[in-house]
Amino acid sequence: MSKFLVFGHRNPDTDAIASSYGWAHLEREVFGRDAEAVVLGTPNEETAFALDYFGVTAPRVVESAKAEGVSQVILTDHNEFQQSIADIKEVEVAAVIDHHRVANFETANPLYMRLEPVGSASSIVYRAFKENGVIPPKEVAGLLLSGLISDTLLLKSPTTHVTDPQVAAELAEIAGVNLEEYGLALLKAGTNLASKSAEELIDIDAKTFGLNGNDVRVAQVNTVDIAEVLERQAEIEAAMTAASVANGYSDFVLMITDIVNSNSEILALGSNMDKVEAAFNFKLENNHAFLAGAVSRKKQVVPQLTDAFNA
């Protein structure tokens, strides 16, 4: 039996790592297949907090599937090829477990594809456990809960699905944690930005989207003080520009999200700033503007950018 690698997107966030870890466990223990969860980048501080809290060793970082001797992979928390492993087009995608839009994706063979408009890929993985009559181990439940908390900002994001609060409650019970207390501690762990270089900061949680022939980089950082992040605007802009030149991004959009007040400041650079302004009906001043109530890249930024770039 061939081995499957299971992984989330590049620049992995907590949900990317948690969902792949949980699905790999399901593959091994329920479906009887050889599967290993790996990651496409070093876990961020929020994810490191969750891994440490539940006593889980961080999965291996890999850069190539073929170099690992596998021919089949399973994707969680993403489907767009430019967000995946470098040689994604050279291996077979056996399954996708995701909660995002489908774009820039095609396969030569049929596959198992499970897409649901829920708050996290971890929510889908937990649902699969329940459907198979299996209670996930405490550490798996803890990671899946962490993925859901992270992606929905403790169920406050507009991406939160009506079923997510119940999922969170059940996972918290299995994991043996208080949902609110653990959730706040997890999110707080992800707001420590002072120790990061500008290059690290813009790469904590970043994805590239193909928008009408443009490669648009959309990154997000969580904070409790937007002004503190903007004090570093010059060096952050320099890092954004350098990344755009090195990788061919037409535009770089950074969401600086206040997780306490549920707002974001948008810092943007590139050749299509008119489209960025049209997307959010605001005017950039000194390359940034306030976006009230925006906390979700998936629901409140990417669809609006997509419409504006296609207009």
From Swiss-Prot:
According to the UniProt entry, its GO molecular function terms are:
inorganic diphosphate phosphatase activity; manganese ion binding
The note on cofactor binding and number reads: Binds 2 manganese ions per subunit.
Domain of life, per UniProt, equals Bacteria
List the EC numbers from the record: 3.6.1.1
Residues that bind Mn(2+) 1? H9, D13, D77
What broad class describes the main subcellular location of this protein?
A: cytoplasm
Annotated catalysed reactions: diphosphate + H2O = 2 phosphate + H(+)
Report the InterPro entries cross-referenced here: DDH_dom, DHH_sf, DHHA2, DHHA2_dom_sf, Mn-dep_inorganic_PyrPase, Oligoribo/pAp-PDE_c-di-AMP_PDE
Where along this sequence does the record place binding of Mn(2+) 2? Answer: D15, D77, H99, D151
UniProt keyword terms in alphabetical order: Cytoplasm, Hydrolase, Manganese, Metal-binding
Q: GO CC: one term?
A: cytoplasm
Q: Where in the cell is it found?
A: Cytoplasm
Which spans of this chain does the record mark as coiled coil?
Answer: none
| Family from the record | Belongs to the PPase class C family.
By what name is this protein known?
Probable manganese-dependent inorganic pyrophosphatase
Q: Which organism is it from?
A: Streptococcus suis (strain 98HAH33)
